[in-house]
Curated annotation (Swiss-Prot):
Pathway connected to this protein: Xenobiotic degradation; atrazine degradation; biuret from cyanurate: step 1/1
InterPro entries: AtzD/Barbiturase, AtzD/Barbiturase_RUA, AtzD/Barbiturase_RUB, AtzD/Barbiturase_RUC
Organism: Rhizobium johnstonii (strain DSM 114642 / LMG 32736 / 3841)
Annotated function: Responsible for the hydrolysis of cyanuric acid, an intermediate formed during catabolism of s-triazine based compounds in herbicides such as atrazine and polymers such as melamine. Catalyzes the hydrolytic opening of the s-triazine ring of cyanuric acid (2,4,6-trihydroxy-s-triazine) to yield carbon dioxide and carboxybiuret, which spontaneously decarboxylates to biuret.
This protein's name: Cyanuric acid amidohydrolase
Gene Ontology biological process terms from the UniProt entry: atrazine catabolic process
Molecular function terms, GO-annotated: cyanuric acid amidohydrolase activity; metal ion binding
Activity regulation, per record: Inhibited by barbituric acid.
Domain topic, free-text comment: The monomer structure is formed from three repeating units (RUs) that share the same structure as one another. The monomer, the active site and substrate all possess threefold rotational symmetry, to the extent that the active site possesses three potential Ser-Lys catalytic dyads. It is possible that any or all of the three active-site serines may act as nucleophile (albeit only one can do so per catalytic cycle).
Residues that hold Mg(2+) according to the record: E283, A332, Q335, G336, P337, G340
Residues forming the catalytic site: K153, S223 (nucleophile)
Family membership: Belongs to the cyclic amide hydrolase (CyAH) family.
RU B, as annotated region: 103-240
Amino acid sequence: MPSLRAHVFRVPADGPDDVAGVEALFASGLQANNIVAVLGKTEGNGCVNDFTRGYATRSFETLFSRYGVDGVSIIMSGGTEGALSPHWTVFARETVETPGERALAIGVSRTPALSPEHLGRREQILLVAEGVKSAMRDAGIDDPADAHFVQIKCPLLTSRRIAEAEAAGRTVATHDTLKSMGLSRGASALGVAVALGEIDATSINDADICTRFDLFSRCASTSSGVELTDHEIIVLGMSAKWSGPLSIDHAVMRDAIDAHSVRKARERLPENSRLAAVLAKAEPDPSGEIDGRRHTMLDDSDIAGTRHARAFVGGVLAGIFGITDLYVSGGAEHQGPPGGGPVAIIVEKEQ
């Protein structure tokens, strides 16, 4: 009985347009049409005017077009503060003549475009929830408990998008383009929570988004960008329909220094295994404290708090895993408890 098999590659990047390492994978035998997703960390500021994300996305679209490949989910997260290293994480899958044995599963989907007036509102939550369910079906994940990380690239509001909506007689959730990033991330994360049964959709209203932080998903990782108007969704989990040496588990950090939870998740994975990728969310604790001690990430007028958080949590995780090419995305609204966030660990068992 055939099964699906996943492959994960961590590739260094010298800049947002550096796809040479991925092209080298093709030269070494990776079939370009087996790639389903690319997660990237680019060296921009991670804010509204971070065009490194779009630059990197266009670079990959150009690369894939040369190989006649389309439909790859390309999700770029800006910001490599501290010692975080710019890199790409490439996900591929293929059909093999091996019975399924419960291994890493990858599913992708893309939603219809989101109208600007629906950003940061219930409509976005429900749209994302349907997209996550579609990606789970694509991955062959039947039980929401088997989903360990849901990565979403979501849109934001720009001055032009706001003006177009208001010219049509519609109102938007905010006129602050930076705030729109958080609203979009938060609504998308709540969509994940609805899809996974963590939250009942009927219990959420517009006013809860980015205010009721007791509502959150333990698996969501959302990143907003100017380069799209829809949502690109990648679901990572475990499925008996897949085979191969890759496994995934996740932790939920209760705060930015919760190394214990991350280590416990690593211990649940095969002991003699190679680290394939680490994917995480980070945000400044909105209380202004970490474990009872004051932090100043939210008071810095020069550097956005999400940038501080990426650097800080990146350092914690680098100390645990001994690598700096970590996918640490800032802004964790409704993604884990306030000040914390999910961390997914992918390993490859020895064969």
